[in-house]
Amino acid sequence: MATVTSSAAVAIPSFAGLKASSTTRAATVKVAVATPRMSIKASLKDVGVVVAATAAAGILAGNAMAAEVLLGSSDGGLAFVPSDLSIASGEKITFKNNAGFPHNVVFDEDEVPAGVDVTKISMPEEDLLNAPGEEYSVTLTEKGTYKFYCAPHAGAGMVGKVTVN
């Protein structure tokens, strides 16, 4: 029987005798100092202008937003939701079929501000929004109170009112 033996010598380096180099050299470093192009006061003024412009844009966008009126309540009722609303002059109202019953939006010619032509703001009585999600939009500019109804369901109480300020 043969026996194999192996012996290896491993050398482990020792750092005990090493000393840190303490060589010092004089070095010259140029540092560029950035000079502000505007003063802090001018910078804060610019920030103020940006904040004011952003706020003004938000206010104007808020005035241009559309009001939404659902045609049919979530429980299937024949109603405009909301049935009474106030908007700013020039604000768009979007009437959206919520329930899938055929609905329309007709403004009552006797219940709008004087001089308003209801044929220009109403849907024709024979036109209907049949499917959920179908929409009709109108923008009212004349200040006053406008009453509207759904022609197929007015007898069931599907009426509404919008006040334009």
Swiss-Prot record:
What GO molecular functions are on record for this protein? copper ion binding; electron transporter, transferring electrons from cytochrome b6/f complex of photosystem II activity
Which InterPro entries does this UniProt record tie to the protein? Answer: BlueCu_1, BlueCu_1_BS, Copper_blue_Plastocyanin, Cupredoxin, Plastocyanin
- Domain of life the protein comes from: Eukaryota
A cellular component term (GO) from this record?
chloroplast thylakoid lumen
Record-linked Pfam families:
Copper-bind (PF00127)
**CDD domains (UniProt xref):** Plastocyanin
- Cofactor(s) annotated in UniProt: Cu(2+)
PROSITE patterns according to UniProt: COPPER_BLUE
Topology relative to the membrane: Peripheral membrane protein
Record Gene3D superfamilies? Cupredoxins - blue copper proteins
Q: Where in the cell is it found?
A: Plastid, Chloroplast thylakoid membrane
Q: Which keywords fit this entry according to its UniProt record?
A: Chloroplast, Copper, Electron transport, Membrane, Metal-binding, Plastid, Thylakoid, Transit peptide, Transport
Residues that hold Cu cation according to the record: 103, 150, 153, 158
Extent of the transit peptide? 1-66
Domain Plastocyanin-like positions = 67-165
Q: Which family does it belong to?
A: Belongs to the plastocyanin family.
Q: What is the purpose of this protein?
A: Participates in electron transfer between P700 and the cytochrome b6-f complex in photosystem I.
Q: What is this protein called?
A: Plastocyanin, chloroplastic
